[in-house]
A protein has these predicted regions:
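Adenine nucleotide-associated cytosolic modules
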Residues: 1-403
């Protein structure tokens, strides 16, 4: 895409005092090139700089000058190059569009108190590091999180850890749904609960623990079991308490695995209501999270069908894939696998709510604890023949269930 010089200048002038983000600090390689954005794969880049003025540019973008003064500083220090102002402005614009620059002159948003800025300051700098989108303020993602309304179904091992991470991070409103009571066998992994909570509804114990963690978050909940897609639809569309602007939840997080069809139901209801959602869990040492947004890439069913084809489990026609990794009546899990699963779910929520990191939904990723360095990653295109989101008519079984 060609960007006009006037547009480039306009982008640059939105910044009062452009500064290379501290986390993206540039350095010069032995070849004289400029490496910027840190050495983290997915963030950093290398810029050729045969004449040395790009290095001067990144040095000048230290948050002490306005854009015009940055251009003047670069041209002043390289008089022999006959640099045009447009060249320098264009390079500055490239750096801004790549996400390496923040506006040191942008005041913190008035909506965030000094106490909140202190509380969430470290998280803001991590978001700033992982963010590759130009923003008016580096606090913008924190505001998005504070305005967010999230529905969490299941507050056990995965859901409890996800709730803990989101509430600590400053999510605005979390509504928790959970029917069970705390049992002794839960305590090896459900770390929101203690021995004094045995026999108590998990919902009450979780809300008490989360309120103690962060009074900034609006915490609500209901003791309820999801028995069908209608229950999920009811939960999603009847936001309680209803937000002043009348909008339902921004996001569904599914951390329940009963009944077994619950993910299929969530997929269907989220497609129908246009709700982004994520689900996480573990199967033995495999821990993963899937994140989905209607209209953006594969849905849960697309991904599941594509993965079944890819894995080629050598199943006979009609044989259910669960025979290859059976579900056990007990739940092999500890605080590590449940905690990782919940943290991945919270991470997916931040991605869907704030766009950080800029990972497109319609994928599943995670860890295989048996083989460090062997990441779990699934991504597929949206499938035309998908029975949930596809455009071709679905094949229907005699009992009316779409397949
Ligand atoms: Zn689909």
């Amino acid at each position: 895409m060609t960007v006009r010089a006037t547009d480039r200048a306009a982008t640059v002038r939105t910044m009062r005092r452009p500064r290379i983000k501290p986390e993206h600090r540039a350095y010069r390689t032995v070849d004289g090139n400029v490496r910027i954005g840190s050495v983290v794969h997915g963030i950093g880049a290398e810029v050729l700089d045969p004449d040395g003025w790009v290095w001067t540019l990144v040095e000048a973008m230290d948050g002490t000058r306005g854009p015009d003064d940055v251009v003047a500083e670069v041209t002043r220090r390289h008089p022999g190059l006959a640099l045009a102002d447009e060249d320098v402005t264009g390079a500055m614009d490239d750096l801004i569009r790549a996400g390496y620059v923040e506006d040191a002159g942008a005041p913190p948003p008035a909506e965030l108190t000094a106490r909140e800025q202190e509380r969430y300051g470290r998280g803001m700098t991590l978001m700033r590091w992982m963010d590759l989108r130009p923003r008016a303020s580096s606090w913008e993602p924190q505001l998005l999180l504070r305005r967010a309304r999230v529905l969490l179904v299941g507050v056990g091992g995965t859901g409890g850890a996800a709730a803990r991470d989101l509430v600590a991070s400053g999510v605005g409103h979390l509504h928790c749904v959970e029917p069970d009571v705390v049992e002794l066998s839960n305590l090896n992994r459900q770390t929101l609960f203690g021995e004094s909570d045995l026999g108590r509804p998990k919902l009450d114990a979780a809300l008490a623990a989360l309120r103690a963690l962060n009074a900034d978050t609006t915490l609500t909940g209901e003791r309820r079991e999801v028995r069908g897609p209608g229950d999920l639809e009811d939960l999603l569309t009847a936001a309680k308490p209803r937000h002043p602007d009348g909008a339902p939840y921004d996001l569904l997080l599914l951390a329940a695995d009963r009944p077994p069809e619950i993910r299929r139901w969530a997929n269907r209801v989220c497609l129908a209501t246009g709700t982004p959602w994520a689900e996480a869990g573990y199967r033995g040492p495999l821990v993963s999270v899937g994140m989905f947004a209607p209209g953006r890439g594969a849905c849960w069913q697309c991904l599941r069908d594509a993965e079944a084809e890819r894995r080629d489990l050598r199943l006979a026609p009609g044989q259910d894939e669960d025979v290859a990794s059976p579900r056990m009546p007990w739940n092999p899990v500890n605080a590590v696998t449940a905690g990782l699963s919940g943290s991945l779910l919270a991470h997916a929520a931040l991605t869907l709510l704030c766009g950080i990191p800029p990972v497109e939904p319609g994928c599943r990723f995670g860890l295989n604890l048996m083989v460090p360095g062997d990441p779990v990653l699934q991504r597929s295109e949206r499938r035309d023949d998908c029975p949930a989101c596809g455009t071709r008519p679905a094949v229907t079984t005699p009992d009316g269930e779409a397949r």
